[in-house]
Amino acid sequence: MEPAEPFVATPEDELSDTAKNARDFLLGLTEKMGVPAEIAVGETAEQLKMVLSGESMSILIGRRGETLDALQYLTSLNVNRGREEYLRVSLDTENYRAKREEALRRLANRMANRAVKTGRKVVMEPMNPYERRILHSALQQNDAVTTHSEGEEPNRHVVITLKQQ
């Protein structure tokens, strides 16, 4: 996976009605949660990227990003309701997504080393599809191990095994 492109906010007067409605919807959610936030929106034809800032952003991130993922899901449902073409919605705050991706890549490499050292498969904890994809991608070029996912949602997890020599 390539590193994410730097965020560039779209000026307010250039935002589409869809982007403004998405921002207002998300502002309503954060206010109801008691976490006031400012939201910058970067808009392309395929995606709305929304970056939240303010105090107490850790509340919006939640445990392993679960709250942020839930807010992203709800905002995406709201944005895409009644639309013919799907518009991808991504949320971030305090550069959480990039930090989490880097932490997952380091974890993948540590667990691959463990598999090589012990000669046994390593079963990772359950993760969402996005995080599993990061692990698979991180180890794709590794000559010693291979990865696959097992289980059913929400308990689907990555398994790291030695490549057959």
Language-model features, listed with the residues they occupy:
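RNA-contacting regions in translation and RNA-metabolism proteins
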Residues: M1-Q165
